Amino acid sequence: METLDAIQLPYLGVVGASLIVILGIILLFPLGSDPFITINQHPRDLFQTKAKQQFEYNAAALLNEGLQTGHSAFRLVTNMVTYLILKDQYAEEIKNDSRFGAHEAVDPVLLVDLPGLESMFQGSLHNQVPPMAVRALNKELVHLTPSLSEEAMNCLQTRWTDSTEWHGVSIPETVLALIAQMTTRALLGPELCRNPEWLDIAKSFTTNRAIAVAAVQSWPSFLQPVIHWFLPPCRALRRQIQCARNIILPALERERRAYCSDQPTKREFSNLVFIDQYAKGARYDATMAQLRIIAVAFQTTSDLVEKVIARLCKHPELIEPLREEVVSVVGNRGLHRHSLRKLTLMESVMKETQRLEPAVIIGMFRLAKEKVTLKDGTVVPKGTNIAFANDLRFDPEMYLEPETFDGYRFQRMREDPAKIDLAPFTKTRMSHLAFGHGKHACPGRFLACDEAKLILCHILLNYDIRAVEGSPPELRARGMFVQLDPGAMMSVRRRRGTETAPHG
């Protein structure tokens, strides 16, 4: 005869499972009316699987659907978190509001604080120091331009050769190699910028980390602190970081000895030394600090340069005017930072490309650290992840024929007193949020601008480029990201009778 406990056990299991489902429904669809509509919310989509998949493959269409509703704010379920999407009109109000956290919005999504994913028992300084280190680097860019120029030409000659016959090259592979070599030169100096082992790590770390994060995020959040120890992408990432440590830590020791033995005023800027001194003896992960900075720098600059080159392949009529501008500005004076600032047509082409093809279709991410009532009465609940819609980049009152690519658009703005402030590439505005806006705007945009210009200068002066016949480079969208097709190719040849531009 069955005992009462034995009889009740199956029913208790059913009841328990039911309670879990009910709790999940309450958490996903809390009681009370939500003043914001959710664009991709679906009935019975308990774990938002359908909504996330829809965003993964139709993010731009969903964003446009939200904008067409007439609401100034709406929710959008993404493959990472659910965002409250705000129109760009709010950017000026929120940009410096301390009630909205920038790092608090990004760090949990990127899992930078997940113990053991990258480092343990070494504190979190490596997550905090990159903005300060990049700002320190910005002050040295005027001195670094000749060195960055030298690395750009070295890399192009190595990859594209001096052949005067047309031959095919990969756009993404070329740009990634250029950015890796140039950024390493800026951050770590001449010792590592041509080190093949380090460059391989630098080029692949960002992608490998993205794969690892995606693998972890596919599991429930309460399992993530444990499951990453067993996931192959995470284990591969930790192995790669250890290889990086075998390079960075000896380099740091050499920098410490050199800094102590030399007069500081005679030493070049070293990002390794800057962070080491910033730590003031505190324990920190020197390797992760460098990888953090490199990951951000690569993402910003490589995306921009790839898309500009692709645009030039589609608009060859811009190549000769750009080349003439470079020749007239550089002349015999070499590529200095002061001469780079005079390349206004080049800046215009870069900014117009970025306006139409930003790396992410939404931007300026924030987390509401408390309940906030905006000036128009819109209430943003505490704990809400917000992002901006990037809608003003298509505002016809701001941009004539905004859907059309116009390489001269921002150059003409320099002649209009009402719009001159919008023209510089590194200037942030609520109508152009590619670098964010306000006190949390991307500090690496100045290095990105200089590197992009130097690369384009050397290409224009020394090579002819064109699209591969029948296969123009195209973009691919996945979730909120818009990137050049990884297989994008173009044809290049060394220009006859040309010489490398002087570096300074």
Swiss-Prot record:
Heme binds at residue 442. SUPFAM superfamilies: Cytochrome P450. It is found in: Membrane. GO terms for molecular function: heme binding; iron ion binding; monooxygenase activity; oxidoreductase activity, acting on paired donors, with incorporation or reduction of molecular oxygen. It catalyses: fumitremorgin C + 2 reduced [NADPH--hemoprotein reductase] + 2 O2 = 12alpha,13alpha-dihydroxyfumitremorgin C + 2 oxidized [NADPH--hemoprotein reductase] + 2 H2O + 2 H(+). Pfam families: p450 (PF00067). Its EC number is 1.14.14.119. GO terms for biological process: verruculogen biosynthetic process. Its cofactor is heme. Pathway: Mycotoxin biosynthesis. CDD domains: CYP503A1-like (cd11041). It is an enzyme of class 1 (oxidoreductase). Gene3D superfamilies: Cytochrome P450. It is a single-pass membrane protein. The chain crosses the membrane at residues 12-32. Its main location: membrane. One of its GO terms (cellular component) is membrane. Keywords: Alkaloid metabolism, Heme, Iron, Membrane, Metal-binding, Monooxygenase, Oxidoreductase, Transmembrane, Transmembrane helix, Virulence. Cytochrome P450 monooxygenase; part of the gene cluster that mediates the biosynthesis of fumitremorgins, indole alkaloids that carry not only intriguing chemical structures, but also interesting biological and pharmacological activities. The biosynthesis of fumitremorgin-type alkaloids begins by condensation of the two amino acids L-tryptophan and L-proline to brevianamide F, catalyzed by the non-ribosomal peptide synthetase ftmA. Brevianamide F is then prenylated by the prenyltransferase ftmPT1/ftmB in the presence of dimethylallyl diphosphate, resulting in the formation of tryprostatin B. PANTHER family: CYTOCHROME P450 (PTHR46206), P450, PUTATIVE (EUROFUNG)-RELATED (PTHR46206:SF3). Belongs to the cytochrome P450 family. This is Fumitremorgin C monooxygenase. It comes from Aspergillus fumigatus (Neosartorya fumigata).
